[in-house]
Each structure stands twice: as C-alpha cells, then as structure tokens.
Amino acid sequence: MDELTRDALNALPEWLRSLADDLAVLAELLKDTQLSEGLRLWVAGAVGYVFKSVDLIPDGIEDLGYLDDVFVLRLAAARVAEENSESDAPLPPSITQLAEGAALVKKLLGSDFARLDDFVSGLRIAVVRGVSPSDIVQDPALAAQVCDEVASFARSYVPPPFSHDERTLIKLKSFLSAKLP
C-alpha cells in the first residue's frame, strides 16, 4: 500500500466522523459580516451542497456516501482561506485545518481534481431549495436559518461506515470521474 492510499484510508473515516462539526464551523462564517461577501458565497455554496438532494455521490451509498460532501467542504474552506489570506479578519483554526485537507483531495483525485474544483466554484451560484448563496449572504435572517438547519443536521447525523480497503478508494475515484461535469 502506497503512502497516498494509507493517508486517504486514515483521513476519510475521520472526515466522515467530523462532517457535522465541520459543516457547523463553516456555516457560522455565514453570520460573520467581517468576512467579505465573496468569502461567504464559498461557504453558502458548500453548505447548500450538503443539503442538495442530488449529490455527485448519493449519501446512502455504502462507504462512499458523504465523501463528496467532505471533499466539497474542504475545497470551499481552502478557497476561503486562500482569499482571506490578505484580510485582517482572522479565520477560526478549524477552517484552516479543513482547508489543509484539500491537498489530500487533490493528490487522491489527480487529474479529476480540477473538475471537482470547478464544480465547487459553481456552487457559489447554485440554487438549492429555491435559495441562492447570494440570498443567504445578503439576508442575515436567512443565514441564521441556514445555521439552524445545519445544527439540526448535526444533531441527527450518524457517520456512515467506511471500509479501510483500497477498493473503496478505487470506487470513489471511479464514481467521481463518471459524475463530475
């Protein structure tokens, strides 16, 4: 087993376990008016994706469900950290940790990473349940409502099982390669 495979098989189950907490930390940024609207659009798009009924990988698929969600959160966090690097508004350390995970996603997906990154960029304008990320960012009451929905999700979220098997990574990469636009 190579180092990348070992790193991924160790990280992915932990990412699945922390999904609810990671989502909650990101969602809290929606209410932080010190952050630019552009940064909060990244967050709103990623948070909306988790609640979207049509995922790249349906959440119920054994071993793979929610992995697309944890990837999207990390890529969005990386964009937030990157674009915030010259700002005076500090980000919570947990956002930086999420952002660091994007490097593993990039290594794992190889040539398909650019397609996922483009997909995540498009989430900034994706409408979920009739609400766009800009609606959320511009309306404090709507941002608070999204945070409440995230808190409700976090209370009921049960991390799915994950097989520490190289075949799981092969299935994951194949699924994303086939589904990414």
Range-by-range predicted roles:
Residues 63-94:
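Membrane-interface alpha-helices
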Residues 46-73:
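Membrane-inserting effector segments that mediate pore formation, membrane fusion
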Residues 31-51:
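Transmembrane alpha-helical segments and their cytosolic interface motifs
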Residues 97-181:
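Intrinsically disordered, low-complexity, charge-dense segments enriched in Lys/Arg
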Residues 22-25:
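Amphipathic, well-ordered alpha-helical segments in soluble domains
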Residues 1-20:
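Polybasic, low-complexity association/targeting segments
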Residues 34, 61, 65, 84-88, ...:
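Long, hydrophobic, amphipathic alpha-helical segments used as structural scaffolds
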